[in-house]
Amino acid sequence: MTVIRKKHPLIKMINHSFIDLPAPSNISSWWNFGSLLGLCLIIQILTGLFLAMHYTSDTATAFSSVAHICRDVNYGWLIRYMHANGASMFFICLFLHVGRGIYYGSYNMIETWNMGIILLFAVMATAFMGYVLPWGQMSFWGATVITNLLSAIPYIGTTLVEWIWGGFSVDKATLTRFFAFHFILPFIITALVLVHLLFLHETGSNNPTGLNSDTDKIPFHPYYTIKDFLGVLILLMVFMILALFFPDILGDPDNYTPANPLNTPPHIKPEWYFLFAYAILRSIPNKLGGVLALILSILILALMPILHTSKQRALTFRPITQTMYWILVADLFILTWIGGQPVEYPFIIIGQTASIAYFTIIMILMPITSVIENNILNLD
C-alpha cells in the first residue's frame, strides 16, 4: 500500500496533499474550516445535482417544480432543505475561515489569500443565482434589484443590465441563464479550490503564533485527519438539526409566494449572508457610490497585506489590535441586522455609522494600533 501511495502518479498527489503533508504541530480548531468548506462544497454539488434532475428553469413551472420536488420526489424535501441550509452552513464556515485568516495574519500568503478572495466572489455569485431559481417573490425581486445595480455603471450600464436579463425585465431568459450559471459555477469553484490548495502547499500552513514552524512539523495523517473528522461530525450535527427541525428559519416567507412582477414585497432583502454588504450598499444615497462600496466591502480584503504595519504576523500577542478586530466583528453583526431592517429612522443612521466604522477600522485604526504596538514593544 505504501508503495502505491508514494509511487502512483495520481495517488502520489493525494498523498502529498492530505497524508504525508508536513503540518505545524500547534494549529488549533480554527484551521478545521478549510476541510469543512470542502465538505460543504461536496454536499452542495451532490444535492444540487439531484435537484437539477427534477427542476425546470421556466417561469411558468419553476415554482411548481420546486413544490413537486418537496411533495412527490422521494426525500425531495430533505434534498431541497439540505441544499438551502447547506448554503448557510457554507457561508458560516467561509466567514469563520476568513475571520481566522485576518486574526492570524494568513493574508501574508498573498497568492493563497487572493485566490481565496476570488473564491469568495465566485461562491457569492453562485448563491445569489441559486436564490433566484425557486422563482418566489423574493427570488424575482431580489434578482431585479441586484442586477439593476449594474445600471449605475456610466455609459454601458443600461445596455449591460438588459444584456444580463436577456430582455427588458427579469423573465424566462434570465431564469434559464441563471440556472445554467448556477449549475456550472460549483465545478469552476472546485477547480479554483485546487489552485487555492496548490498555493497553500507552496508556503505551508500558518499557525496560531504566526512564527515559522519549519522546525516543528507533524504528518497531516493521522493527527489532523482525526481532528478534522471531529469538526465534520459537529458540522453535520448542526447542519442536520437545521435542515430537519428548523428548515425555514433562515429563509424568507415571501419566497413561498410565486413571483409576481405586479406586486412588490414591502421589504426586499437578500439571504442573511449578504445582509452586511446590502447594508453598506444602502447606506450610501448615491447609486454608483453604493455599488462601489458594496464591491469594496469584499475587495478591501485584498488590501490586508498592504495595510499590515505590525512587526508581528498574528494578533495573538497584540491586545490593542485584538480589541479593534473584535469591534469589527461586532460591527459586521450590526450591519447584518441593519440589512434586514426597513429603510427608515433610526436604521438608516445606524447603517451609515456602521458602514463608516467598517472601512475606518480596517483601513485606518488597525494599521495605526499596529504601529503603536510596535513602538510599545520597541519593534520599530
Curated annotation (Swiss-Prot):
Cysteine disulfide partners in this protein: none
GO molecular function: metal ion binding; ubiquinol-cytochrome-c reductase activity
Statement: the UniProt record of this protein carries the keyword Iron: yes
Keywords of this entry: Electron transport, Heme, Iron, Membrane, Metal-binding, Mitochondrion, Mitochondrion inner membrane, Respiratory chain, Transmembrane, Transmembrane helix, Transport, Ubiquinone
Residues engaged in binding heme b b562: H83, H182
Subcellular location(s) of the protein: Mitochondrion inner membrane
Positions of transmembrane segments: 33-53, 77-98, 113-133, 178-198, 226-246, 288-308, 320-340, 347-367
Cofactor(s) the protein requires to work: heme b
Chain positions recorded as a ubiquinone binding sites: H201
Gene Ontology cellular component annotations, sorted alphabetically: mitochondrial inner membrane; respiratory chain complex III
Pfam families: Cytochrom_B_C (PF00032), Cytochrome_B (PF00033)
Lipid bilayer topology: Multi-pass membrane protein
DNA damage in keyword set: no
GO biological process, one term: mitochondrial electron transport, ubiquinol to cytochrome c
CC cofactor note: Binds 2 heme b groups non-covalently.
Entries under InterPro entries matching the protein: Cyt_b/b6_C, Cyt_b/b6_C_sf, Cyt_b/b6_N, Cytb/b6-like_sf, Cytochrome_b, Cytochrome_b_C_euk/bac, Cytochrome_b_N_euk/bac, Di-haem_cyt_TM
Main location: mitochondrion
Residues binding heme b b566, per UniProt: H97, H196
Note: Heme 1 (or BL or b562) is low-potential and absorbs at about 562 nm, and heme 2 (or BH or b566) is high-potential and absorbs at about 566 nm.
Subunit structure: The cytochrome bc1 complex contains 11 subunits: 3 respiratory subunits (MT-CYB, CYC1 and UQCRFS1), 2 core proteins (UQCRC1 and UQCRC2) and 6 low-molecular weight proteins (UQCRH/QCR6, UQCRB/QCR7, UQCRQ/QCR8, UQCR10/QCR9, UQCR11/QCR10 and a cleavage product of UQCRFS1). This cytochrome bc1 complex then forms a dimer.
Function of the molecule: Component of the ubiquinol-cytochrome c reductase complex (complex III or cytochrome b-c1 complex) that is part of the mitochondrial respiratory chain. The b-c1 complex mediates electron transfer from ubiquinol to cytochrome c. Contributes to the generation of a proton gradient across the mitochondrial membrane that is then used for ATP synthesis.
Protein family according to the UniProt entry: Belongs to the cytochrome b family.
PANTHER family tied to this protein: CYTOCHROME B (PTHR19271:SF16)
Protein name (database record): Cytochrome b
The species this protein was found in: Alexandromys middendorffii (Middendorf's vole)
